[in-house]
UniProtKB/Swiss-Prot annotation:
The gene is bsc8. Mg(2+) 2 binds at D92. Substrate binds at D92, N228. The lineage of its organism: Eukaryota, Fungi, Dikarya, Ascomycota, Pezizomycotina. Isopentenyl diphosphate binds at K416, R419, H448, R465. Dimethylallyl diphosphate binds at R464, K542, T543, Q580, N587, K597. It comes from Alternaria brassicicola (Dark leaf spot agent). Residues 351-376 are annotated as: Disordered. In the N-terminal section; belongs to the terpene synthase family. Its EC number is 4.2.3.43, 2.5.1.29. Pathway: Mycotoxin biosynthesis. This is Fusicoccadiene synthase. The keyword Cytoplasm does not apply.
Length: 697
C-alpha cells in the first residue's frame, strides 16, 4: 500500500492504552478539509432539521476523526466523507434517547428517503425527515460528481447498514459478550464505514469478495467496537439513565453483568480483549499481503483499516465528544461561529487538481517474491524409477491450477454485481440461510462466467470489462475447455445444494442458454435479422434464464411459507429483457461501455441487438446499413468510421429515442410487478428497489 497523503505521528506524544499495539497512528495532511465538511454538515442540520444543542461530533483539537481513521483518504474526497460522517453522528445522537420501535421506524424512513431521493421523488414525510432528505440529496449529488461508481457502491453499503444496524437492537438486553459482539459489529457501523473508506480511497471491492472481506475484518471490528465502548461508556451510561433504561447497550455493561465486575474492571477486561483481537487482525494483514488470489483493492482496504483502529483509539482519548474538558482548535471555533470560508485550498493546490483525482491506491506484491516449481519425480537415468511410476495406480489427480487460470482471470475482472445484488434482494423475502445463499451465488457466478467466456469466444470480443477477453490471454481452446469445466462444477454444486430438483432446473436453463446462443450465432453468420418476437425469445432463453435459475434455486432453499413462483418468474423474465435491452443501448451510447468493451463492440460481433433489429425493420431498403453488415461478416470487424456510419443510419429512424421509451416502459412494469410481489410476501423490499434504481438510465 502506498502512503501519499499522511504522516506517522510520533508515538511518544500519545498513549494508546494497549488498544492498538503494533499499529502506527497516521494523520492526513489535509485535516482542514475534514473541519470544513463536518462544520458544513452541522450548519445544514441546524438549517434544515433542528437547532444543534451541546453537540460534539467528530472534530478534535489535534486529532479529528476522519483525519486519523482514514489517513490515506484522497484529499478531494475528504470533505464530503467528513460531511457524511458528521451527519451519521448527529443522526445517532438524535435517535439515541428514542425507543427501539421509533428508532427502527426512523431507520426505515431514512432508508426510504435514501431510495426515494436518489430516484428523484419524495414520499410525504414530516418536516424533520424532509430536511434529512434534502441533506442526503446534497450529499449523494456531491459524491456522484466525484465518482459515480464508488458513490453507488457506498449508497448500497449505507442502505445495508440502515437495514441491519444503526441502533435497531438498542432495546435488547445483552448479558453475554458472545451474543453482544456480533450485534456490535453491525451497530458500530461496519457497512457504513466500508462505504466511507472505499469511497474516500477510491477502492472497488468486488461483490464476490464481500464474504472474505467480512471474515478478514471481523477481529478489527470487534476491536473497534470494544475500544469505542470503553471510551463512550460514561456518555452511553448517562444517556440510558436519562431514558430510564435498566441496561446499557455497551460491552462494559455486558461484562459487568456476565462476570460481576466493577465498572473499571469491566473496562480493563474490554481493553485486554480488544488487544487480542487487534493481534488477530494484524495476523490477517500479514497473511494476505502477497495473496494474489485476493484483489489488490481488498488487500489495500484490509491494510488501510488498521489505521481506523489506532485512529479511533487516539481520537476517543482526546475528542471533546467523550472528554468534556477538551476544546476545539481556534480555526474550528472561528468557522463554527463565523461561517465557513467560500473555498479551501489543498495546501496551495486547487481542490480540483488532477494529482488528487487518482482512482487507485494499490500496493503491489513484494518484488523479492519467489515462485516455487515442483520437481518432476521419477525422471532419472535408471529406468526402474520410470517403471515404478508407471505401475503406481494410486497417483493423485492433477491440480486444478491450469484449468482454473482462465476462470480466476475472468472472476477477478470488475463487475457491476447485479446478480449478487438480485440474490441478496430475493433473500429479503425467501429467508435462505447464509451458507446456502452463498452457494447459490457461487453457482450462478460460475455459470455466468462460463457464459461470458463462451460468448466472448463465439462473438470474437476483444475486451471484457476493459481487459483483454480470456481467449485473447489463454487461447480459444483453453478458454473453451475451462468454461465447460466451470459448467460441470456448477452442476455438482447445485446437486449438493438442491438435489435432483436443482439439477433439473439447471439443465433446463442450460438448454435454454445453448438454444438462445445458437439463434444469435445463426443470425449473425447468415445476415438473417430476427423478428422482434425472435429477438425477445432469444433474450428470454439467455439473459432471463439465468435470473430465473437464480430465483428457482433460492425458492428451492427457501424457508418462507408463501412463495409466489409465477410472479417471481414474470419479474425475472422482465428483468432479463430490461437488462439486455439496456446493455444493447449502452453498448452503442455509453463511454463507460466503450472503455470496458471497445467502441460499439456489438457491431464488431455482428450481433443483432434491438437497436439494429429496429433500424432494419424501419428501413428495409437501407442498402448502406445492410452492406456495412456484409462487410463486417467478410472482414470480421468494422473500423470506427464504419461504426459511426452505422450509428448515423440507425439514428435516421430515431433508434435511441425508441429504446429509451421501451426501457422506461419496462422499468415502470418492473416496479409495478415488484409491488405485486411485495404484497404477496406482505413485505416491502428496499434492496430490490435499490437494484432497480441503480439499473435505471
Amino acid at each position: 500500500m502506498k502512503y501519499q497523503f499522511s504522516i506517522i505521528v510520533d508515538p511518544a506524544t500519545y498513549d494508546n492504552e494497549g488498544l492498538s499495539n503494533g499499529i502506527d497512528l497516521r494523520k492526513n495532511n489535509f485535516t482542514h478539509l475534514e473541519d470544513r465538511g463536518a462544520i458544513r454538515a452541522q450548519q445544514d442540520w441546524a438549517t434544515h432539521i433542528a437547532p444543534i444543542k451541546q453537540f460534539k461530533g467528530t472534530l478534535g483539537h489535534d486529532y479529528s476523526f476522519m483525519t486519523v481513521c482514514v489517513p490515506e483518504c484522497i484529499p478531494i474526497r475528504l470533505e464530503i466523507i467528513s460531511y457524511a460522517n458528521e451527519f451519521a453522528f448527529m443522526y445517532d445522537d438524535d435517535t439515541e434517547l428514542d425507543t427501539e420501535n421509533n428508532t427502527s421506524a426512523e431507520n426505515d424512513k431514512l432508508m426510504g428517503t435514501f431510495l426515494a431521493g436518489t430516484q428523484g421523488w419524495s414520499p410525504p414525510q414530516d418536516q424533520s425527515s424532509s430536511g434529512k432528505t434534502r441533506i442526503l440529496k446534497q450529499l449523494f449529488s456531491e459524491m456522484m460528481e466525484i465518482d459515480k461508481e464508488c458513490a453507488i457502491a457506498t449508497m448500497k453499503a449505507w442502505a445495508e447498514f440502515l437495514r441491519v444496524g444503526s441502533s435497531r437492537q438498542h432495546g435488547t438486553v445483552f448479558t453475554r459478550l458472545k451474543d453482544y459482539l456480533p450485534y456490535r459489529i453491525k451497530d458500530v457501523g461496519e457497512m457504513f464505514w466500508f462505504g466511507v473508506v472505499t469511497f474516500g480511497m477510491a477502492l472497488h471491492i468486488p461483490d464476490h469478495e464481500m464474504d472474505a472481506c467480512h471474515k478478514l475484518m471481523e477481529p478489527a471490528w470487534i476491536a473497534v467496537g470494544l475500544a469505542n465502548d470503553v471510551f463512550s461508556w460514561p456518555k452511553e451510561r448517562d444517556a440510558s439513565q436519562r431514558l430510564g433504561r435498566t441496561h446499557v447497550v455497551n460491552a462494559v455493561w455486558v461484562v459487568m453483568q456476565e462476570h460481576g465486575f466493577s465498572q473499571e474492571q469491566a473496562r480493563q477486561y474490554c481493553r485486554e480483549l480488544a488487544a487480542q483481537f487487534v493481534a488477530q487482525y494484524l495476523d490477517n494483514i500479514r497473511n494476505i499481503k502477497n495473496e494474489e488470489s485476493i484483489s489488490p483493492d481488498l488487500r489495500t482496504y484490509v491494510e488501510a483499516m488498521q489505521y481506523s483502529i489506532s485512529g479511533n483509539v487516539i481520537w476517543s482519548k482526546f475528542c471533546p465528544r467523550y472528554n468534556p474538558e477538551k476544546r476545539f482548535n481556534q480555526t474550528q471555533l472561528d468557522w463554527m461561529q463565523n461561517g465557513l470560508p467560500s473555498t479551501v485550498e489543498l495546501d496551495g493546490a486547487s481542490n480540483t487538481s488532477s494529482s488528487f483525482l487518482s482512482t487507485s491506491t494499490h500496493g503491489s506484491p513484494a518484488s523479492g517474491s519467489q515462485t516455487t516449481i515442483e520437481s518432476k519425480d521419477g525422471w532419472t537415468a535408471d529406468s526402474s524409477g520410470i517403471v515404478s511410476l508407471l505401475l503406481n495406480c494410486s497417483l493423485p489427480p492433477l491440480s486444478h491450477k491450469v484449468i482454473s487460470a482462465p476462470l480466476t482471470y475472468v472472476d477477478s475482472l470488475p463487475s457491476k454485481g447485479t446478480r449478487d445484488m438480485f440474490l441478496d434482494a430475493l433473500n429479503h423475502w425467501l429467508h435462505v440461510d447464509e451458507q446456502r445463499a452463498s452457494q447459490v451465488k457461487m453457482a450462478i457466478r460460475m455459470l455466468h462466467n462460463a457464459s461470458l467466456m463462451l460468448d466472448d469466444v463465439q462473438d470474437g470480443s476483444r475486451l471484457r470489462r476493459s481487459k483483454p477477453s480470456a481467449h485473447r490471454v489463454f487461447g480459444v481452446a483453453q478458454t473453451t475447455n475451462s468454461a465447460a469445466f466451470l459448467v460441470n462444477e456448477s452442476i455438482k454444486l447445485i446437486r449438493e445444494l438442491a438435489g435432483d430438483q436443482g439439477v433439473a432446473a439447471v439443465l433446463e436453463k442450460l438448454t435454454s442458454l445453448f438454444v438462445g446462443q445458437a439463434q444469435d450465432l445463426h443470425s449473425s453468420r447468415n445476415l438473417s435479422p430476427p423478428s422482434l418476437t425472435e429477438y425477445i425469445q432469444t433474450i428470454d432463453q439467455k439473459t432471463s434464464a439465468l435470473f430465473e435459475l437464480a430465483s428457482r434455486l433460492m425458492c428451492l432453499c427457501s424457508t418462507a411459507t408463501v412463495v409466489p413462483n409465477s410472479s417471481l418468474s414474470r419479474f425475472c423474465i422482465l428483468l432479463g429483457r430490461f437488462f439486455q435491452i439496456r446493455d444493447d443501448y449502452q453498448n452503442l451510447t455509453s463511454p463507460e461501455y466503450t472503455k470496458q468493451k471497445g467502441f460499439c463492440d456489438d457491431l464488431d460481433s455482428g450481433t443483432y441487438t434491438l437497436p439494429l433489429v429496429y433500424a432494419i425493420s424501419q428501413q428495409s431498403e437501407n442498402f448502406l446499413l445492410q452492406n456495412l453488415l456484409s462487410t463486417r461478416l467478410a472482414e470480421g470487424t468494422l473500423d470506427d468510421d464504419q461504426k459511426r456510419l452505422a450509428l448515423d443510419q440507425m439514428q435516421l429512424v430515431k433508434t435511441n429515442e425508441f429504446l429509451r421509451k421501451i426501457l422506461d416502459s419496462l422499468y415502470d412494469e418492473l416496479r409495478a410487478e415488484l409491488q405485486c410481489i411485495s404484497s404477496s410476501f406482505a413485505s416491502e423490499n428496499p434492496q430490490m428497489e435499490l437494484m432497480l434504481m441503480m439499473l435505471k438510465l
